[in-house]
């Protein structure tokens, strides 16, 4: 009864259990400030819960458009960025998608789920994008997925390499989920390149992973096409209200981002050569320590394939980071971890 395609998938799993420190999901360690939550709750008291939300999430789209200085017709909102990814795989004509491993696994997941072949163009040894090689494989592609900063390596991709791919005029989804942590974005290129889709989220910098709010910036033609196939009412009133209020307090988000970046750089200095440079809210660490950390009550992300023997570590609160660093010193030996 169940399709063979579905049987070929494994459920997405995370480590469950009562662990004292969780640094595995790239979450923001800081919750929304209480006053921001109260503002959301106050607005929700005036909303009718018995009515469906706006069919195309226009209140949230207008708030995001005002924030960027674009038209709401350039904005689409999803129940998390994953929802938008699932549609973007189906939106365009072409024979395959292109991904650049090691990268975010959901690109290939949604492609395979929709029966779309996946073509891989590995990142260079330093994890940078090979724009020329990607452009070659982009011919007849439905869409090219590029994450910048990349997950799980953490590095920002060179603008000139991304532009090489955009010049093919094939659809390019630039996933900027972590852009706030580096302060650089290519969203303004949507005017010059109608084939560009910039994907963003409220889960990371804004600390709203539990709300499930993602959005994209693109040309009107792409946004219009997406809403032709997007499930109606998928973005609820809670999500839309939280988006509007959070954007009014973007200055608080920026303060939180600065704290996380400071901690990230402190951790990187302490880890020395074990840690790769990062432009995101996590670090890629060259250390086969997943099980040993788990024994100490610390959950990180175990990596495989090309990154076998590496872990990805979310930047947490200072005490969490200190506990992680102390554990690494015990596991790797003091000489491998500088400054501890």
Swiss-Prot record:
Catalytic activity: L-histidinol phosphate + 2-oxoglutarate = 3-(imidazol-4-yl)-2-oxopropyl phosphate + L-glutamate
Pathway where it operates: Amino-acid biosynthesis; L-histidine biosynthesis; L-histidine from 5-phospho-alpha-D-ribose 1-diphosphate: step 7/9
Gene Ontology biological process terms in this record: L-histidine biosynthetic process
Modified residues annotated as N6-(pyridoxal phosphate)lysine in this record: 204
Enzyme Commission no: 2.6.1.9
Bilayer-crossing regions: none
Highest taxon listed in the record's lineage: Archaea
Needed cofactors: pyridoxal 5'-phosphate
MF GO annotations: histidinol-phosphate transaminase activity; pyridoxal phosphate binding
Keywords: Amino-acid biosynthesis, Aminotransferase, Histidine biosynthesis, Pyridoxal phosphate, Transferase
PANTHER family given in the database record: HISTIDINOL-PHOSPHATE AMINOTRANSFERASE, HISTIDINOL-PHOSPHATE AMINOTRANSFERASE-RELATED
Family that this chain belongs to: Belongs to the class-II pyridoxal-phosphate-dependent aminotransferase family. Histidinol-phosphate aminotransferase subfamily.
Record's protein name: Histidinol-phosphate aminotransferase
Gene name in the database record: hisC
